[in-house]
Amino acid sequence: MRYTIRPLDTATWAAFAELAERNNGVFGGCWCMACHPEVSRTDAAQNRAGKERRVRGGRAHAALVFDDSGTAQGWCQYGSPEELPGIKHKREYDKDPPPPPDWRITCFFVDKKHRGQGIARAALEGALDQIAHLGGGLVEAISEVTAGREAQGRFLFSATVELFEQNGFTRARQVGKHAWIMSRVIEPT
């Protein structure tokens, strides 16, 4: 299947919101706010409103993946470290921080009925393309190794090390039992 990638912005907000609502606000109401500073751990409506404010204010970035019918089926969130200060394994990360990235990739989501169809790959490739158009630079992600083990999908909201490696990222440092800081420089276009 061919996918269309579009940035998350005011024109695509309704499609993003429909995908999130179709999936219980994503992970029970996160709305892909967990890495933003104003996340609520208990109020899905607050997260939805916060995400919409960020999108309408140009302070949220994501590559949305649309299927042939024009329905959003997944995304990859990215942004500056200031936009996305909340990261997995932060305590271990801060013990020996890598060079400051220009961009962070923090979150993937794929509709439950469409997993295993290449949507996360399309989302990552779309995010990297959008980053290149925004000036490129050092891109960082913290992801999970899945080779040789069975990983629960709910823990793979930051995708897999293998997917990042297939897209030119290298492992910088291990920060959790299966978690690695991944990095790659993206040239501007």
Set out the residue ranges of the language-model regions:
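Conserved N-terminal entry element of GNAT/NAT acetyltransferase domains
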Residues: 1-35
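Conserved beta-hairpin
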Residues: 16, 60-76
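Aromatic- and Gly/Pro-rich amphipathic surface segment
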Residues: 25-57
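A short helix-loop-beta-strand connector motif used in the catalytic cores of GNAT acetyltransferases and
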Residues: 46-64, 81-86, 104
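Conserved acyl-donor/pantetheine-binding loop and adjacent beta-alpha core of acyl/acetyltransferases
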Residues: 71-107, 115, 151-158, 165
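Conserved acetyl-CoA-binding loop-helix of GNAT-fold acetyltransferases
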Residues: 105-110, 116-133
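Conserved GNAT acetyl-CoA-binding A-motif
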Residues: 124, 131-153
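C-terminal "cap" of GNAT-fold acetyltransferases
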Residues: 154-161, 165-167, 172-189
